[in-house]
């Protein structure tokens, strides 16, 4: 973008595809994106503070530095959809598998040091439910659990995978290891004894007991201060219609508890 008030061309969505956001203690933001994939560091106004941090030896077809004779090794839109943090360190996670992966369920988790601005070289392997499962988001809880949101690319009655898993020992997990995960919540089978939405949205898909978050791009999982969890939808407006067929999905957010 260039206009009479700009000295240089402004960065836009044609340059980067921001997907995951982490706010640092100083109020700045770290952003995971998918074109590079890169990690970006911006201030509270969105001004880029450092040159984009490239991931070593991985490039998507949309990477601007990809040479004419160079082969990409990560599919488009399979970069850093998810990124967790424990404060100093970021944990960007590939949404899909790397092209050279022998087991295409593996989703690589890496560690990035915000103080040095470098990847530490530590990685962990997380096994998704199947080759095509997508990592929608990740979150590190205060007690050291890594929450991983897995989803498929379907909506409504066709949706089969919208689940939150937890890695209970991530804080102590050895680098280079394959992580052990446990199911925390099936978002297609949420108990709804309070009948939330059953009167106001009686014709909507998945509104009942159990409640189903059977929407396409479920891409948020966080734990709230009171212990509940929040998940949310990227509605890809106006393309998705998981709740009412033929009607663009709203941006839905729901909170739930785990007993």
Task: Give residue ranges: language-model regions.
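Sequence/structural signature of beta-propeller domains
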Residues: 1-259
């Amino acid at each position: 973008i260039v206009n009479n008030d700009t000295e240089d061309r402004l960065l836009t969505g044609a340059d980067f595809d921001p997907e995951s956001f982490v706010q640092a203690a100083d109020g700045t933001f770290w952003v995971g994106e998918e074109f590079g994939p890169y990690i970006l560091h911006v201030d509270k106004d969105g001004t880029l503070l450092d040159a984009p941090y490239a991931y070593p030896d991985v490039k998507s077809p949309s990477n601007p530095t990809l040479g004419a004779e160079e082969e990409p090794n990560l599919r488009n839109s399979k970069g850093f959809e998810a990124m967790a943090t424990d404060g100093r360190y970021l944990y960007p996670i590939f949404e899909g598998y790397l092209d050279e992966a022998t087991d295409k369920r593996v989703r690589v988790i890496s560690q990035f040091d915000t103080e040095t601005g470098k990847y530490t070289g530590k990685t962990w392997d997380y096994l998704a439910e199947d080759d095509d499962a997508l990592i929608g988001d990740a979150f590190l809880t205060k007690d050291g659990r890594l929450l991983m949101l897995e989803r498929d690319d379907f909506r409504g009655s066709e949706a089969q995978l919208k689940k939150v898993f937890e890695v209970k020992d991530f804080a102590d997990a050895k680098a280079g290891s394959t992580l052990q995960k446990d199911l925390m919540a099936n978002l297609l089978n949420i108990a709804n004894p309070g009948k939330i939405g059953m009167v106001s949205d009686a014709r909507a898909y998945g509104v009942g007991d159990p409640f189903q978050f059977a929407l396409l791009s479920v891409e948020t999982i966080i734990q709230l201060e009171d212990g509940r969890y929040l998940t949310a939808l990227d509605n890809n407006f106006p393309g998705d219609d998981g709740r009412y067929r033929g009607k663009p999905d709203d941006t839905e957010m729901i909170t739930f508890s785990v007993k």
